[in-house]
């Protein structure tokens, strides 16, 4: 495994992967766009409050490591960023649409159950059933160039095991257990969060459209 991202780098890459699929008309993203995406209060765990300077430092580091590239074509007054983390022309990591959706959701929200992942990743890929989610996770866990995810030990009193990505190195399961949010209705919460995320995306699109009309 050659990926050793910090938590903030994982957030930046996760945001770019997400916006590439969910709001392609706004992609690539400017620094301000990345800041807004990183600090979203929906579909993010933990919620962050990064400054523009902090995000710029992460972007510069990721460009140097060839995980991102800058885009500044004709008529672009602002430098924008696009991901080269996966499925890029010269990159080694190739993922299916289902794999991208799960990896992105894990980068943005940490350890989750297959049920939570199916609900939360639905804006990026519509999984036909739980079997597809689980088989995709198993592929990511058993790839020869990986593994990219790991199945965690099932916690006492929980019906499902959670999965975590390995792009930030090995997983400290004890730390994850102590920081895991308690929820008696995880599936309902996931659906509410998915709806909140859709509303946030629509608001972002509307703001972008209004800003464009005002130019």
UniProtKB/Swiss-Prot annotation:
It comes from the Bacteria. InterPro entries: DUF480, WH-like_DNA-bd_sf, WH_DNA-bd_sf. SUPFAM superfamilies: Winged helix' DNA-binding domain. Belongs to the UPF0502 family. HAMAP family: UPF0502. This is UPF0502 protein YceH.
